[in-house]
Amino acid sequence: MQKLIMGNWKMNGSSASIKELCKGISEVNYNSEKVAVAVFPSSVYVKEVLAQLPKEIGVGLQNITFYDNGAYTGELSAEMLHDVGCNYLLIGHSERRSLFGETDQDVFKKLNKIIDTSVVPVVCIGESLEDRQGGRLEKVLTTQLSLILENLSIEQLARVIIAYEPVWAIGTGVVASLEQVQETHQFIRSLVAKVDENLAKNMKIVYGGSLKAENAKDILSLPDVDGGLIGGASLKASEFNEIINQANKICTE
């Protein structure tokens, strides 16, 4: 299966630094049939990034609202996402959930806004350290995915990418063990298999949580890991490019 390497730039960057970052990422060599690459800049820089990156690198928004338009100051709509030329969308990132109170219902409503379009939805799920230590991992992930798996058709679900990000490993430098990553990805795939086994086999499930160049090979080589959602390491072209290179090697060996 093609690996998917994505960079979530979060609320970082300036026109100058993003120009330098795009220049660096543009220099990476990889087989685009084996590896897909996408980045999620801050929305104010999307047009700049689209203009500066090669066309084969996807560009997405980090969030949208589920409202169509109107008096919702500060929000971005699905129509705006299309209008600026984005082809990816992050939905339900743990920071959206924890800092802004985003719920599973909100995630589902946002997904519904773009599920029948050409935009690739990346739905983020993950547990807190308390949930994992309390033995609630499977319950939490099942709940986070239930609305999506129960209400979308197989054809719609086939467009969805799931990003597993243990909340306790995001931006902390703490990385889940290889066993934890594989077991959790395998569990997520088993949830999808209850809907359709072929869907589960082909659905991309990527890992996010302090993924960096030094651990990329081991994590991306796991049988149920189809790529990565990279945070801090994606802000350095050399490191992000090395992760892309590692994915490319895995897919071509």
From Swiss-Prot:
Protein's cellular compartments: Cytoplasm
Keyword Lipid metabolism set for record: no
Catalytic activity of the protein: D-glyceraldehyde 3-phosphate = dihydroxyacetone phosphate
GO molecular function: triose-phosphate isomerase activity
Matching Pfam families: TIM
GO cellular component, one term: cytosol
CDD domains: TIM
Binding of substrate, residues: 8-10, 171, 210, 231-232
Gene3D superfamilies cross-referenced by the UniProt entry: Aldolase class I
Top-rank EC class of the record's enzyme: isomerase
Protein name from the UniProt record: Triosephosphate isomerase
Source organism of the structure: Francisella philomiragia subsp. philomiragia (strain ATCC 25017 / CCUG 19701 / FSC 153 / O#319-036)
